[in-house]
């Protein structure tokens, strides 16, 4: 739902802010904060890239990524807890609280990012063409081969990986 996406983005933004603040304190500690700096790095590893992938999966206009990042970063402490504000920054058109319960479909960017040996440019081409994860999962090898930069090897790799991911989800192995 829109609420789920907004909540994930809210948490990712809070993690980004807390990490930034802790990093400032660690810089003041100098060499005495080295161990703590390593622990913080371990805790937040991958959080920034996950944040960007979730944004790319759900923002209304993928070309607005820089604007969305800037607006989320500039939200004040009182507005970061407002899921409606976060949803609207993402371009998800939330006008009342009930709109937060609307179903929303990802583009498939995160799913494609899990396909080994798939370049970012290929991910952009495929996700822009298919617009949603269900459309992407329904694509055949032939459909994918028609896209620029996606040959038979990549097309087969994508379809096999997406099928494997779908099986893992339906089997309850992963929760997304």
Predicted regions and their residues:
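Long, highly charged, low-complexity intrinsically disordered interaction regions
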Residues: 2-146, 152-176
